Amino acid sequence: MKISFKISIVLSLFSALLFTSGFYASNDSIQFIKTNWVENSEGVIIVNSHKELLAYYNVNLKKFSLGSREKIASDSTIGFANAIEKYDEEYFKNSSIIIAILEENSGSYRHKYDGYSVNKIGTLTVSIKTTCDSDYATCDMAGWHVIIETNKLDNIKETKLCKTGLHQ
């Protein structure tokens, strides 16, 4: 009885080590950028170079309205182009950025970054909590790009988005 209990504990610990390698929380620099909503666009990408960032920007500029914003409305944020100005070739020598693309069924929703984890088999999971500051939400669709600064990320095989809060 005691031996099988010990084996159970050892197997549980081994599983925890195999499937979770680090959880990186809100001490990372995070930017929440309100962009256009595009159906079936939700996901996570990793950007490891200035060239990759410019390619993403150029391919998706019109699709998500990723330009800069001179005037910022009370229900909006800076533009994506404004947000990425600081990420030059020097930044990417030792760092990466993670971009989480979110789809929401209300422009009233806001977000809290809960962190990301990378497991031993190379799956990166970003956790975002959706909130609403008021009792009522609008019925307009909204898109968001969440930019997360991190140390260099290599050997990532797959990315996942875990949304909590209003989506539970």
Regions found by a protein language model. Name each.
Residues 6-8, 18-168:
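Exposed, flexible binding/inhibitory loops of compact, secreted disulfide-stabilized domains
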